[in-house]
Amino acid sequence: MNINGPVNVYLAGEAVKSEVVPFGEITISLEDSKLLEEFKKDYDELVIKCIKTDFTVPGVDINLYDEINISYREKWDVKMLKFKNKELRRIIFDTIGALNDLTQYLTDEYMRVLETPHGLELIARNQSWEQGCKLREVLRPQTTKLRYKLRDLYRELHPEEYEGMPPFDDYPEGEE
């Protein structure tokens, strides 16, 4: 047999497909799924901790700022860019953004260190009329909004756990 010109070769068997994984109502690539599991391993406990923390009462973890900042700075500032699915990327960006937004309220402007029998903790600054106003008008409403946002994002990160459940309908005053 004499063959002149290009030759097409077909292999018998299944065509190579990129694997997809269900994620709520969408599907994501296997690579995104693995990256998501790594993200959840690094961030789930931290997100839950932030959701449960009332930043206006004594006992805020003095290490919370570092826990948020270090995980982002040392790993996820670049790694979060690797998510290919737009919806998943939005959830990841919004989660990291909300956590990073919380860190501004863990600074000297809003908090002071309190020595307790349990060690050092943070407490909201409230030693003057101005600081009390800032606590009521800025710290409480802003951290509450961020905590609700993180709660909703956590639910989006774990669609399998909330399947069939109605959406949350409790939001901070004036929000929805």
Model-derived segments and their meaning:
Residues 21-176:
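Long, low-complexity or tandemly repetitive, helically biased scaffold regions used
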